[in-house]
From Swiss-Prot:
One of its GO terms (molecular function) is alcohol dehydrogenase (NADP+) activity. NADP(+) binds at residues 16-40. Its EC number is 1.1.1.-. PANTHER family: (+)-NEOMENTHOL DEHYDROGENASE, (+)-NEOMENTHOL DEHYDROGENASE-RELATED. This is Short-chain dehydrogenase/reductase 2b. It comes from the Eukaryota. The active site is at residue 220. Induction: Not induced by pathogen infection and not detected in healthy leaves. GO terms for cellular component: cytosol. The keyword ATP-binding does not apply. Keywords: NADP, Oxidoreductase. It comes from Arabidopsis thaliana (Mouse-ear cress). Pfam families: adh_short, adh_short_C2. Aldehyde reductase that catalyzes the reduction of the aldehyde carbonyl groups on saturated and alpha,beta-unsaturated aldehydes with more than 5 carbons.
Length: 296
């Protein structure tokens, strides 16, 4: 019997948190993992840690530097994968930022206390909002565009966009944006851009306008709502690829200063499940809240 050909996965933001654990779980299942991160030192250390822990070979997991907000960096990774592996089976867009400044002491002191308003511990700036959109929305979009040709060479291609329940349309206060992003039939990338540009224009004029967009973390909410909308567009455009977004749950990570409820193992299990589902059993164009299909 012919040996099964290896399956290859890229995980962005793989040096820590949920991304690191996704890499661990995939490698443990025999998937060959390309762990990526902006920070080369941290990425290389993460790969060495996993090789020792899982007792796997140099071929089982490799590191490649990646900044999803930099087109040159994305192209460099695509060339690397094409040259060394010839195809891609799984793309997990996990890299992301919160887009806010957090008063960590106040957050830790208040977490779990009755009447605590965590939104009062954070501050949004235009610069952070812009970076958040670049990384959380345009980053995955750029990755998908670069890797679809390599995914099309797989017999079981899938894209998993790690999103958030905060990106559900119901969390938008702006009715105009809500209308555009919930209109599945007429969704286009241009319309998503219009929503994003309007948010950034509003924040550039006055950061207080954030309250017209979401109750809290407006750039983060819009970036994830945009990512969910793009997931639907991509699934329709490429029926041969299983494309889904997933909220891993409120996980203890560096992004929320370990105030989450779930462990990274629990959080990573949801994107990993979607990555490994048999092709014929895998839905496409869905938003998952952990392991359950939910509304966009």
């Amino acid at each position: 019997m012919a040996e099964e050909s290896p399956r290859y996965a890229i995980v962005t933001g793989g040096n820590r948190g949920i991304g690191f654990e996704i890499c661990r779980q995939l490698a443990n299942k025999g998937i060959r993992v390309i762990l990526t991160s902006r920070d080369e030192k941290q990425g290389l250390e993460a790969v060495e840690t996993l090789k020792k822990e899982l007792e796997i070979s140099d071929q089982s997991i490799v590191f490649h530097q990646l900044d999803v907000s930099d087109p040159v960096s994305v192209t460099s990774l695509a060339e690397f994968v094409k040259t060394h592996f010839g195809k891609l089976d799984i793309l997990i867009n996990n890299a992301g930022v919160g887009g806010v400044i957090t008063d960590v002491d106040a957050l830790r002191a208040g977490t779990g206390k009755e009447g605590f308003k965590w939104e009062e511990t954070i501050t949004e700036t235009y610069e952070l909002a812009e970076e958040c959109i670049k990384i959380n929305y345009y980053g995955p979009k750029r990755m998908c565009e670069a890797f679809i040709p390599l995914l099309q060479l797989s017999d079981s291609p899938r894209i998993i966009n790690v999103s958030s329940f905060m990106g559900q349309v119901k969390n938008l206060v702006n009715e105009w944006a809500k209308g555009i992003l919930s209109d599945a039939e007429n969704l286009t990338e241009v319309r998503i851009d219009q929503v994003i540009n309007q948010l950034l224009n509003d924040l550039k004029e006055d950061t207080a306008k954030t309250k017209y967009w979401a109750k809290v973390m407006s750039a983060y909410v819009v970036s994830k709502a945009g990512l969910n909308a793009y997931t639907r567009i991509l699934a329709k455009k490429h029926p041969e690829i299983r494309v889904n977004s997933v909220c891993p749950g409120f996980v203890k990570t560096d992004m929320n200063f370990k105030t989450g409820i779930l462990s990274v193992e629990e959080g990573a299990s949801s994107p990993v499940r979607l990555a490994l589902l048999p092709h014929q059993e895998s839905p496409s164009g869905c938003f998952f809240d952990r392991k359950q299909v939910s509304e966009f």
